């Protein structure tokens, strides 16, 4: 990882910078997400591939959780220095892993409390909602 990439990640970890970027790019500059509503999330996600059942490590650049009006959603800023045609697929992988992490936590909670959904094929109870996962790619290339 280059010094430039580290500097970009370091800057984006400041919650006020992060919220400004999100507000400008998602909400047209309206102050919807404040720095106070953000908390840092681990960037490392461990997931299991379906094809060969092996564990894989994914590394998101700067993920944060936003708690607003008793609801939560996840935001991730990804830096891109050069054009990369597979970036959307990588982002889908990050989002998939984050959703699967939430499902795993909800199912574990159900197991601990013996509060299983009915029928079991539903996997989650009707009251268990997944928090949205939103990724923004910041492309710094000139192309």
Where are these regions (language model features)?
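Accessory alpha/beta interaction modules
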Residues: 1-143
């Amino acid at each position: 990882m280059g010094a430039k990439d580290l500097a970009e990640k370091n800057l984006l970890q400041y919650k006020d910078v992060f919220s400004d970027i999100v507000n400008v790019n998602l909400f047209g500059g309206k102050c919807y997400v404040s720095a106070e509503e953000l908390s840092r999330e681990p960037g490392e996600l461990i997931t299991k591939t379906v094809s060969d059942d092996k564990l894989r490590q994914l590394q998101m650049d700067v993920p944060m959780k936003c708690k607003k009006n008793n609801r939560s959603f996840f935001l991730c800023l990804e830096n891109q220095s050069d054009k990369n045609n597979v970036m959307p697929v990588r982002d889908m992988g990050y989002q998939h892993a984050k959703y699967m992490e939430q499902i795993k936590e909800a199912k574990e909670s159900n197991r601990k409390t013996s509060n299983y959904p009915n029928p079991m094929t539903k996997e989650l109870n009707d009251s268990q909602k997944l928090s949205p996962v939103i990724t923004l790619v910041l492309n710094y290339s000139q192309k």
